[in-house]
Structure formats: C-alpha cells, structure tokens
C-alpha cells in the first residue's frame, strides 16, 4: 500500500496549479510556524515521509525492547567503574552521572536514529542527551496537513499525525511527579536551558509557548543567567522547578566553574532536570559496543538480545585488541547459554563466533565499516569506509587510533 500511496502523492503534484499553491503555503508556513533553524527553512520541499501504521507499530515495539536494554546498561554502569570506562565516560563525567536525578529513566527524552527500508529496520546511533527536532516536527506536521496537495491526498488515504510537544510535556510532568515522590501537587515552572545564540532558538520558543498554553509557566534562559541560593534555583526572581536541559554536557563543562548554579542546584536535589547528566551514559556511541558485545549479554533477557541482534549494528571500541566477529550475530556468553538451557529456553540458534584482530580486520573491510568518534554530534569526525580510497581509510585508521576514543561500526 505504501508504494501506491507515494505514487499517488507524486501524481497529484503533476497538477501544476495544485503544486504551485501547495508550495506557496509551505513557504509561508515556515515563518508562521517557526520551522526555522539558524535562519533557514527546515523543510522546503513538498515531500513528506509516509510510514504505514503496521510499520509504525513495529518500530515502537523494537524501540521499547532496545530501550529496556539501555536502561539495564545504565543500572549496571552507575555501580561499575569498569563499565563506565568501557563507555568512555571521563572522570568529571563519572562524578556527574553518579548524582541521583530523582527519577529512574536514564534518558526520558531521546532519539534513536535509524533507517527503515522495505528489507530492514536498523539503528545507527542514539542521541540520549538533548535531542532537537521534537517541536520542529510538530510545526512541519501542521504545515503539511494544511497543504492543498495533502488535503487532496487525504480524500483517498487516512493520515495520522505524530505529536511531539504533548508527549514532551507529559515526560517532564511524569519526571516531576516521580521527583516529588509521586505526590506532585502543582504544575512546575519549567526552564528551557541552553547556551545563547543557538540555531535552535525557534524550537525553544515553540516549546515555551506550548507549555504555557497547557498551564505550565515556562522561561528560556542560559546557565549563566541562573542563581542558586542553596534552596531554590532562580532566573531573576522566578523560582524554577523543572529544567528542560537542552544544554550539552560537553558545552557546559568549559563554563561550569563560572556558571555553577545549575550543577549546584541539581546536586542538591533542588531541581528536577530532564534529561539528567546520566543521559551521557547512553549518549556515548560506545553504548552500541556494549549492547553488541557478548561480554555484557548477561545484562539482557532473550527478547532484548534478539532485538539487539536484529536491529543494532555490530560495534566495537576501536583499539588494538582481539574481539569476536562472525557473519551471523550472537550476543550470549557461555554462562548466559547455560542459563537459558537450564530455564528451558535453549531453542534459539547460536553460532560460535570467530576471533579477529580488530584493527587489521577493519583495515581490510572498509566496504562495510564506518569509524566515528565516541562523543560528538552533527557528523563531525566520521569516516565512511565505502566512500574512502585505501589511502584515505588508512589515514582514518591512524587518526582514530591516535585519538583513542573512536568506534568502528558495521554498515
């Protein structure tokens, strides 16, 4: 059905007048709906992304399983310095992630980046710190639902919009209630906190206006503007209850000493901060190396392991070492196999993985590998093997080894 629906949408755009009018509405909608990133329109084309209800249900099911596994990694990591080291958590970050945020979820608002094709559904990485795009997506939805071409399309096909801001507010209020011991008696004042002058300013405004429309006072501020009196966190005379933290840890660390109020209030348990600093645990790209390593398979149950095998690309920290690799994935240690056998759950197929020299294997398998930094974003520092010459790939390997905090990941 999806192919037929997309073909019909393209057919509608062959109507010149309909396409021109739809494009006009799209262009005008960007400014009106604040679908602007750094001064430029975010979605300037008349091409939405359609997904079937069946596929959407599948995506939700798989995400729930993967998220369950990620939560278990967090639970283990806060008690295990060796696992923190494997994730690439620095000493100062270790101090931050060991502070209890007052709620259980490791990253209440996160984005699992993935590819969905007719053949497979595969995750690429996880933004577990402070993902952008939630409110922007709402704006794009509002604009596209108003297009003449979309209204014509809906005469034949039923559409369901995905709403982000209501769910984001629900997450903040749920964390706030848990933070209050399940006895929150009022709606919190929410501060959206990030550095000044960022291209996502319009999205902050979209969130602020929505929160206010739902009865939650909200402000936008930078960490430098905050003050902590030992009991409450303030923006001027305004007392803050919940911090919707869009500020990245890597951007806060350099200014933490001159803008300590946010950390001091968080450490004192004076604010509910979402996401907490513990989001850094799953934001590290090495989280996929932990998920796909047999060394940590004892953390997960069978359904989680099966989901990891099917949807998480094989990933390793890039270093001089021997590791296991074979054509058919498996994530269970011998101890885990014995456990499943003892519980009558030994029917899953398992292979005996082969051992490889990781660096040399990476050198000879560039056609299916990428090298990426453990803790960066926006595509910085990524080397794509299948787009590289032998010389370029060798240089990438040397760069990654010298850096010491890179991942190698299968395509």
Question: Predicted regions span which residues?
Answer:
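Preference for protein termini
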Residues: 1-411
């Amino acid at each position: 059905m999806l192919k037929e629906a997309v073909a019909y949408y393209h057919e509608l755009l062959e109507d010149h007048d309909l396409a021109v009018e739809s494009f006009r509405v799209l262009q005008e909608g960007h400014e009106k709906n604040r679908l602007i990133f750094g001064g430029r329109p975010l979605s300037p084309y008349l091409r939405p992304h359609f997904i079937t209800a069946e596929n959407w249900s599948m995506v939700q099911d798989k995400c729930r399983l993967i998220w369950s596994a990620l939560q278990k990694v967090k639970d283990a990591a806060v008690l295990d310095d060796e696992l923190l080291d494997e994730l690439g958590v620095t000493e100062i970050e270790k101090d931050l992630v060991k502070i209890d945020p007052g709620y259980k979820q490791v990253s209440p608002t996160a984005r699992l980046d993935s590819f969905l094709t007719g053949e497979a559904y595969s995750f690429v990485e996880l933004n577990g710190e402070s993902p952008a795009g939630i409110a922007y997506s709402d704006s794009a939805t509002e604009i596209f639902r108003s297009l003449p071409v979309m209204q014509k399309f809906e005469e034949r096909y039923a559409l369901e919009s995905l709403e982000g801001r209501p769910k984001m507010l629900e997450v903040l209020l749920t964390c706030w209630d848990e933070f209050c011991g399940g006895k929150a008696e009022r709606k919190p004042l929410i501060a959206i906190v990030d550095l000044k002058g960022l291209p996502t300013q319009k999205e902050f405004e979209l969130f602020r206006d929505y929160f206010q429309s739902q009865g939650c006072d909200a402000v936008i501020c930078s960490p430098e503007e905050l003050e902590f009196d030992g009991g409450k966190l303030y923006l001027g005379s305004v007392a803050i209850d919940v911090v919707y933290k869009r500020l990245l840890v890597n951007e806060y660390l350099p200014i933490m000493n001159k803008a300590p109020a946010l950390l001091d209030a968080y450490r004192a348990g004076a604010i509910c901060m979402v996401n907490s600093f513990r989001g850094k645990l799953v934001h590290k790209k090495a989280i996929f190396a932990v998920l796909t390593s047999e060394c940590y398979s004892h953390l997960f149950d069978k359904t989680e392991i099966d989901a990891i095998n099917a949807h998480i690309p094989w990933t390793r920290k890039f270093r001089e070492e021997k590791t296991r690799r074979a054509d058919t994935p498996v994530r269970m240690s011998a101890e885990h196999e014995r456990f499943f056998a003892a519980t009558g759950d030994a029917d899953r197929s398992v292979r005996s993985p082969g051992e490889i020299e990781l660096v040399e294997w990476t050198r000879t398998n560039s056609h299916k590998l990428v090298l990426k930094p453990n803790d960066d974003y926006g595509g910085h520092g990524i080397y794509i093997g299948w787009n590289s010459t032998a010389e370029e790939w060798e240089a990438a390997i040397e760069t990654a080894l010298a850096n010491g905090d890179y991942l190698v990941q299968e395509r």
